[in-house]
Amino acid sequence: MNAFNSEKPRRFPAFTILLIIIVAGLAIGGYYLAPRFERNAPQITLTPDSDVLGVAPLEIVVTDQGAGLKSVTATLSVGGTEHNLAGEQYAEPVKEKKLTVAASKIAGIKEGPAVLRITARDGSLWGFFKGNETVVQKNLTIDVTPPTVELIADDRYINFGGAGAIVYKASPDTVTSGVRIGDYFFPGTKGQVKDQPEHFFALFAHPYNVPGSAKAVLVATDKAGNTREMALVYELKNVKYRKSTIALTDSFLQNKVVPLVKDADARQGAVKDVFVAVNKRLRKENEDKIAAITRKSTPAILWNGAFAQLSNSKVEANFADERTYTYNNQPIDSAYHVGYDLSVTKRYPVEAANSGRVVFTGDLGIYGNTVILDHGVGLFTLYSHLSSIEVKDGESIKQRQILGRTGETGLAGGDHLHYGVYLQGVAVLPVEWWDAKWIHDNIEPKLEGRSGEEIAKAQAPAPRKTTRKRGR
């Protein structure tokens, strides 16, 4: 018998080893395959979230950030007929799919109740390798008929760069309506026409920067995006706008232009380059801000009668003057002057042209200290280069109330008032609104509910007087 006991090496049973291998394999496989078994279903969003479908497109966005999309189908059932909008299978999963649907583009579609059904399945191995599925079903109404409009009263003549007004009716399904010309839109509002609460009244312009050949169109759009258009017919009276040249001096550039540049580095450049930057970039920023402010108006008329020119004032510069700026006798830039420059004496009291509400007070770049009044239904007046401001935002203003005093803030070359009139963000000819006869002939009859025939007769030029020679 040996003095020392010897033990045999411990062996793992083959079954245990096999089990370990299987578990390890499953763990490794699970690590790599787990994402393929993800349970996050695809997402489906509809924009806009509307219950009608017509001309306006409905955008369907299907996404899956996990395994990716494997298939997307979309159908639209209307009156027992099913229209296939999409039926796609993807060999390689995709993360996003966009579909655009417009009822007006579906051949043979009928109006009435409809059901939109979108089904999306991803490439996951979950659900016995079928993947995750999302189904969205939405009840809609198919509407491809545009609203109706009826023109009640319009203008026979409109000045180039000036304003016009119309009265019209639109069917109850209308959600937006007004006048479109070029890239500009002038919405109509209800409740302005005497004894006709359902009639729309719209002020609009034939802007100075829109070609005379451009046609104004009355448009009405419903919830489904269906649009009715009616051409407005009027004679466009030519208005000749001046061209002028302004010679820039070093003193003006250093004392007036350079301080308007906020960037210290930019102020160090050549003075003519600084001017061009101010005249282009800063002017555009300021005019964009004015346009944004003067596109948000109260839907009620706040003014009464003709607008008042600054008392005792002299016109120094006209509306839509095309100005060429020169430096050392060389043209370096140009711009349109979208208002009237009025001067009296230094620090002269600036009066409100008509009753309204203050919607802006403060510094406005090249315009300096500025007050903007909202007179309702898209009509605004602007008062710039003020040395002081004596009203506050939101304040109700009476005609001839003092707003501030004239000055030479901003890009003003001397003490004066820059006065502008705006319609829905568009600068228009101010002199019309100073003219009591123009308002009496073109605006007030429409607000009084007079017929188009009556207005046309009032606007017609007086017949020429003729003298017959007696025969011998």
Task: Spell out what each predicted region is.
Residues 307-454:
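Catalytic cores of peptidoglycan-degrading enzymes
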Residues 49, 62-63, 304-305, 347, ...:
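Short, flexible, glycine/charge-rich loop motifs used to bind or transfer phosphoryl groups or to couple energy/partner
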Residues 158-160, 170, 177-180, 189-243, ...:
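Contiguous, well-folded functional domains in the mature portion of proteins
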Residues 90, 248-251, 449-452:
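Juxtamembrane/interface motifs at transmembrane-helix termini
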Residues 2-198, 203-211, 217-242:
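Surface-exposed loop/turn and intrinsically disordered segments
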Residues 113, 135, 153, 163, ...:
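Extracytoplasmic
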Residues 163, 170, 176-321, 326-329:
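Non-catalytic extracellular/periplasmic "stalk"
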